[in-house]
């Protein structure tokens, strides 16, 4: 009896179940299922490949002693394969959903069904990891303030084209952890390769830092980008602010508090304007310990959005780290108050952290972000 095969398939089944049905509570169980299901949720085809390899090895090795052994193996394999198929199907719907969200905001999705998307789809199916193109340079650990955590990495093309917009990315991690090195690599690489100047910044974290410290860091990074984008060929007048989870929280507040001196004490006159926002699986409620009526608002949901720049928001329906309700509420607020209708793409089956690998889902989102920025921030890049 091939017990090793049975245990392997059952183990994979646990990962698949965690991705399909992650609980919201209790918190400990939610965190465990998030960790177990995060990767397989984005690249289920690799799970299917493992199933095929394990089954093939058992057949070649003659591990099946009786027909009952074969029946059990086939039943387990079919059950887990069905779960993997469901994960893949949910991920593949993302492109149509992003396209519909763009159309809802009055933007025609140029990249949703063209040959470029198909070619890239094959590439990420075979190799689902973001690799920095040879055309893109990364300049590491540039200081944007006096604190040791106030450092950023700059991504730009080797040939330094001029006139491209700029992008500031802030990582997630609940304000407790995370760094500029891990999330949204595909976003930074793709836009840098297009001729943008892209920046990924660290910021001070809890428990040594509080809400105003985080916002000061976000604003200082913005001010640095406005001042220094031209050093790398970028146009500092056009800045897209983006982030994942906590980074999306900071980005949204920064966009709704442009030039507000309360959020940038000590450098009140610095340019911290934002041209557009991209929020990935963001938390948009109040900061730890704050209430909705805090003197210094820590939630975009209670801030004035009448002058808000264009927003692109996306969130997964099974996110058990930051509720999708937050994004729904922010999208509704922007529709009611903002000058431009937001793009809001709600992705079936997407979990927190979907930007950690290059997947079908994240590729569809990146195509949507390109369409969004092309519409609200026309790109004019001069190649040298």
List where the protein language model places each region:
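Primarily recognizes the serine-hydrolase "nucleophile elbow" in alpha/beta-hydrolase
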Residues: 220-292
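N-terminal cap/lid segment of alpha/beta-hydrolase-fold proteins
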Residues: 15, 22, 32-60, 64-65, ...
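Acidic catalytic loop of the alpha/beta-hydrolase fold
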Residues: 285-286, 318-322
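Short alpha-helix in the alpha/beta-hydrolase fold that links the catalytic acid
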Residues: 300, 309, 323-333
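Short beta-strand element of the alpha/beta-hydrolase
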Residues: 163-174
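Short amphipathic alpha-helix adjacent to the substrate-entry channel of hydrolases
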Residues: 181-199
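Short beta-strand/loop motif that positions the catalytic acidic residue
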Residues: 307, 313-315, 319
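C-terminal catalytic histidine-bearing segment of alpha/beta-hydrolase fold enzymes
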Residues: 2-31, 37-52, 324, 328, ...
